[in-house]
Amino acid sequence: MTKLTRRELALAFGAGALAGTAQASTRRPSVHPGVVGVAEARAELGKALGQETARLAMAGALAASVGAASGAEAAAVLFSPRDVVGIKVNCLAGKNLSPRVELVEALVNLVAETGVDRRNIVVFERSNRELQRAGFEIRESGPPYRCIGTNNDFDREPSTSGAIGSCFARMVSSTCSALVSFGVVKDHDLSGVSAGMKNWYGVIHNPNKYHDNGCDPYIADVARHPYIRNKLRLTVLDGVIAQCHGGPAYRQGGIFKLGMVAASTDPVAADLWAWREIESERAKRGMPNLEAAGRPVRYLASAAKAGLGIDDPERLSVVTV
């Protein structure tokens, strides 16, 4: 295991950054249940978004998600200058179906505008290798921001939440005071949908244990652990290129140009929106819905029951900019 001492972490993140980071920041975000902000962002498969397009899309989706006048104003609602902000990206599927670097960097810039030291903004995934495969550059220290794999740096002792018992990455248990899930709009061969919530499987040491019964209630149980629940500020979904069949790995025949970026302070609503878009594309192709295909999306009901967000389609409010 790759372990960093507290002194090494302090040097990496800046003096005083680690004081009290095991607890969530005193700033509690303004949660908007059921609200998902969506902005247009179009690009071809394998092609980058223009920097300005990425900036406008991220700022627009973020502002719409909290009813702010601008992306900067929205970020200031969600993050405090004292935060250590961890952005968990899902790079399992490689470059063709991972969060686009330019969108992630647009979010980093918005967070930095709130006064968060760029050394205290870290983009992370399970390993350096996964980040590099998705097009990210490993950066042990910032600015412009840190980008590293957790690389098996887990707590020594497991903790429980509902039906799960896992060692969590120290990045979420000890280092970060605020978290963002940055996922992709795609289907999953077991849970039906893999968007923002299942991304947190990447911070536990034993995710392979929690795939029975469509990953239910395990996705919800990971997300309701205090390390996640008390620190999660935002879910962002890259839907520039999405996938409706063949996930969670990249499958060329299953991709489609959704051309959207979504943001929400409600992780359940974010995944509900992704589910809706996936089902819409499957219907256009004459494919059975996910339940008929043997992949019912069960975990959202469990997450809503746990108080994590809204799973009722009638209460989903999509604000498009």
Predicted regions located by residue number:
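N-terminal secretory signal peptides and thylakoid transit peptides that target proteins
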Residues: 1-17
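Flexible, active-site-proximal loop/turn residues at the rims of small-molecule/cofactor binding pockets
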Residues: 15, 91, 185
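Extended, low-polarity segments enriched in aliphatic/aromatic residues
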Residues: 27-81, 94-105, 109-321
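Sequence-pattern detector for short linear motifs
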Residues: 9-10, 91, 201
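Boundary at the C-terminal end of the N-terminal hydrophobic targeting segment
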Residues: 22-24
